[in-house]
Amino acid sequence: MGEARTIRKQEVAVLRHAIAAGITLIDTAEMYGDGGAEEVLGEALRGTGGERDRLFIVSKLYPWNASRHDTKVACERSLKRLGTDRIDLYLLHWRGEHSLADTVSAFEELKRDGKIRHWGVSNFDTDDMRELYAVTDGSNCATNQVYYNLARRWPEASLLPWQRERGISTMAYSPLDQGKLINRPSLASIAARLGVTPSQVALAWLMHEKDVVAIPKSSRIEGVDEILGARRVKLDVADIALLNKAFPPPKSNASMETT
């Protein structure tokens, strides 16, 4: 999103449809379209008739902008592109060369100034999270956004248990494994029985996980409606057993994966 101005009108329309249909969490980043995605979201928000207060906007910071000074500068740029006075959740996109202490200090200052409501990280493994927790105010981390889906269950080995013990939620990006999951027989079988789509089954599986928030994406209105429909899918014990057989939980030494 935000990479081509020729389709911006379509992207804005899809976002406005999603907001009108009841989607409240919208995830973006300064990396997406080099700020273009934030601009598209900002344009969409301007036409929603005051829906901003109902929405939970997530954006992410480049790691090379994560010094104490540059974090605040980057946040101001994102706020301007989004056309809003605050970001609900601001994440470090992945770990870089700047110290976690400096980044956290900047996040806490942005919170005090009302520029952001919460902060977190993305693409951190368990060791990274332990290091984060060791710095001053590191325990204020609200979430960790990671690559997690039925085919990529590595967070279950140690990351999810560690975060749950500390009240840190997990945001699952690429919940459909970049579309690779939709042709898997086990998903198709459950979907056919329930009268839904394989994508909706994959999303429903994530939604039943404690403290996990799935963040699927779609560039089409039909895709948005399919995502919304996943909330009504109820998987039973037999469904979960079938999925666990087709997509076994990880071994204890599973390592982090990213897209």
PLM features per residue range, with description:
Residues 1-55:
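N-terminal binding-site loop/beta-alpha segment at the start of enzyme catalytic domains
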Residues 26, 87, 119:
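Glycine-centered flexible beta-alpha turn that most often forms the glycine-rich phosphate-binding loop
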Residues 52-65, 89-93, 123, 146-148:
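A short, structured active-site edge motif that brings together acidic residues
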